[in-house]
């Protein structure tokens, strides 16, 4: 939504003042497979810890991604590109982040350690600049019910359609969606905090 807290807050306040519905497109919140998983395990509770790895290899030799030419991704890296997606899974399951520690690793990698309102903790590893053979996405929860992993999802097209449907429903009902501009503002606050701690 924005890469500064001030910018995100301006958007959120404008939406509130105009009384308009909003959606922030965090893919995994709307892809049918992952949205159902988030809802199920958020309702289950009893989670002790979680780990999210979002490891991209956009600029590795042999990589063939249309996103590799993006100047914005080169400048802001995995923290801002894929960080919102990882957090958009962890927060609805484990609760809001109450404390965050961040550190940098090799090739623009960011490591986050999070405490959540539920009492659980989680760790997150984010990069777009890993070797090609190291790339992948994995999110696991561990708790009273065992170990569960995020299912695979079928791209962004279906998720985008679901996000549009959610926006229309929010307009019709007047009920705010949990992944709206206020959630986008919260994500921006967390990512800006992580960036400041780890160093640009």
PLM region spans:
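Beta-strand-loop-alpha-helix segment that lines the small-molecule cofactor/substrate pocket
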Residues: 1-29
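Contiguous beta-strand/loop segments that form the cofactor/metal-binding neighborhood of enzyme cores
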Residues: 75, 81-153, 164-174, 192
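Generic alpha-helical segment signature
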Residues: 30, 157-160
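Predominantly a Rossmann-like dinucleotide-binding segment in NAD(P)-dependent oxidoreductases
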Residues: 21, 28-100
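Structured beta->alpha junctions
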Residues: 26-29, 104, 130, 183
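Short, flexible active-site-adjacent loop segments at beta-strand->alpha-helix junctions, enriched
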Residues: 26-29, 53-58, 128, 145, ...
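C-terminal helix-rich "cap/oligomerization" subdomain common to oxidoreductases
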Residues: 12, 17-20, 117, 169-200
């Amino acid at each position: 939504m924005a890469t500064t807290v001030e910018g995100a807050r301006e958007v959120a306040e404008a939406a509130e003042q105009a009384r308009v519905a909003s959606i922030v497109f965090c893919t995994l919140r709307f892809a049918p497979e992952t949205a159902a998983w988030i809802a199920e395990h958020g309702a289950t509770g009893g989670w002790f810890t979680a780990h999210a790895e979002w490891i991209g290899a956009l600029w590795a030799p042999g990589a063939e991604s249309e996103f590799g030419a993006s100047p914005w991704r080169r400048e802001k890296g995995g923290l801002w590109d894929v960080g919102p997606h990882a957090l958009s899974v962890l927060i609805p399951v484990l609760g809001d982040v109450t404390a965050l520690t961040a550190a940098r690793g090799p090739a623009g990698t960011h490591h986050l350690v999070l405490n959540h309102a539920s009492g659980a903790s989680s760790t997150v590893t984010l990069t777009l600049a890993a070797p090609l053979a190291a790339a992948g996405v994995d999110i696991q929860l561990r708790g009273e019910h065992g170990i569960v992993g995020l299912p695979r999802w079928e791209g962004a097209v279906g998720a985008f359609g679901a996000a549009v449907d959610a926006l229309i429903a929010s307009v019709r009902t007047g009920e705010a969606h949990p992944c709206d501009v206020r959630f986008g503002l919260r994500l921006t606050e967390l990512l800006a905090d992580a960036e400041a701690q780890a160093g640009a």
